[in-house]
């Protein structure tokens, strides 16, 4: 790249070229339900073990009696200004869906939408390199891709993985009595909105980036614990939205200890400054009827859209110590945020 191109690249702020940010770009659960309500006859394949019926993180196809193939895709608009970091975050987020099923990634294909008349191709190159870096960290190749001229920058991956069928974890198989653990703090939507509002301090920006660039590779190890009954990642629908998928799929109620939910440093300070993403309101409008009465403060935390968020684990009390030991061994703070129980009311989530 020429010196003039480098100078131009350094002055470009990618978030100014998009109307949304990261997983906050997701179509709301309510609208998505309408989109997926197909009028066509249902086609079934006995080898498709996981489809979109349970809104799980990825599709799983039975290859033989022992191995399944995992397929997923995820892409979004810039959540940070730096192109390399944007690509790395987007790729890390896409790969996470493989880990959330308990699998290991095999390869990835890039998905790129780029406003070629607004942003230099050299910037797109940096975005793709960021994606390539995340793939390298996951031990896989960025094996190809597809690009289009688009009005806003978009980047992500289609990822293929594999899973030993005995280790397959889903989001709708939790059991009453399971304890709930979360592997990353909440608050990405709040901090990235603070960035758009030019309120985010540099040190807090780096904390958010570090969290979003952390691979959820621990999921493949968590899946080998037999007492882990359900597993998913927390992304654009927020903690409450993904917890509701766990509860509704298994017909259980979550007893959530809101005070135990880990938050990114100073997330509450930015929340007090009004840094609430639009995705938070869309999330609450979509599933708020299934939640208990919440203050605006509680809504802002529970419905905050995450990008490359952590894993939500439902584990039996008998296997809880094994999970805690595994997380500690990988320098992940084991944080229990609640439990699952047989419903005693119509509420899917209650606060304790």
UniProtKB/Swiss-Prot annotation:
Known cofactor(s): Mg(2+)
InterPro entries given in the database record: PurM-like_C_dom, PurM-like_C_sf, PurM-like_N, PurM-like_N_sf, SelD_I, SPS/SelD
GO cellular component terms attached to this protein's record: cytoplasm
CDD domains linked: SelD (cd02195)
Keyword set, alphabetical order: ATP-binding, Kinase, Magnesium, Metal-binding, Nucleotide-binding, Selenium, Transferase
Database matches in SUPFAM superfamilies: PurM C-terminal domain-like, PurM N-terminal domain-like
Domain of life: Bacteria
EC number: 2.7.9.3
UniProt record, GO biological process: selenocysteine biosynthetic process
Catalytic site: 23
PANTHER family registered for this protein in UniProt: INACTIVE SELENIDE, WATER DIKINASE-LIKE PROTEIN-RELATED (PTHR10256:SF0), SELENIDE, WATER DIKINASE (PTHR10256)
HAMAP family: SelD
Family, similarity comment: Belongs to the selenophosphate synthase 1 family. Class I subfamily.
Function: Synthesizes selenophosphate from selenide and ATP.
Subunit structure of this chain's protein: Homodimer.
Protein's recorded name: Selenide, water dikinase
Primary gene name: selD
């Amino acid at each position: 790249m020429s010196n003039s191109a480098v100078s131009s690249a350094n002055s470009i702020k990618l978030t100014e070229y998009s109307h949304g940010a990261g997983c906050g770009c997701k179509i709301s659960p309510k609208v998505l339900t309408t989109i997926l309500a197909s009028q066509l006859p249902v086609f079934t394949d006995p080898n498709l073990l996981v489809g979109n019926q349970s809104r799980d993180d990825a599709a799983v196809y039975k290859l033989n009696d022992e191995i399944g193939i995992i397929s997923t895709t995820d892409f979004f608009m810039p959540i940070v200004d730096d192109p390399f970091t944007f690509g790395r975050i987007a790729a890390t987020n896409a790969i996470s869906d493989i880990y959330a099923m308990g699998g290991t990634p095999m390869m990835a294909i890039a998905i790129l939408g780029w406003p070629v008349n607004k942003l230099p191709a050299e910037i797109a190159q940096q975005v793709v390199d960021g994606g390539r870096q995340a793939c390298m960290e996951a031990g896989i190749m960025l094996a190809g891709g597809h690009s289009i001229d688009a009005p806003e920058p978009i980047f992500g991956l289609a990822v293929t993985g594999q899973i030993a069928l005995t280790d397959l974890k889903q989001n709708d198989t939790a059991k009453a009595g399971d304890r709930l653990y979360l592997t990353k703090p909440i608050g990405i939507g709040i901090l990235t909105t603070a960035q758009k509002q030019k309120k985010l301090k540099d040190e807090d920006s780096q904390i958010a980036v570090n969290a979003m660039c952390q691979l959820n590779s621990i999921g493949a190890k968590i899946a080998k614990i037999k007492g882990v009954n359900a597993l998913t990642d927390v992304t654009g629908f927020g903690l409450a939205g993904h917890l509701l998928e766990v509860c509704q799929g298994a017909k259980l109620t979550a007893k959530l200890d809101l005070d135990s939910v880990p938050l990114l440093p100073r997330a509450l300070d930015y929340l007090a400054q009004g840094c609430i993403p639009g995705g938070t309101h869309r999330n609450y409008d979509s599933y708020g009827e299934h939640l208990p009465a919440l203050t605006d403060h509680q809504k802002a935390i529970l419905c905050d859209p995450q990008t490359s968020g952590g894993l939500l684990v439902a584990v039996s009390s008998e296997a809880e110590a094994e999970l805690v030991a595994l997380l500690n061994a990988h320098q992940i703070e084991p944080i229990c945020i609640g439990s699952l129980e047989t419903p005693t009311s119509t509420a899917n989530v209650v606060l304790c």
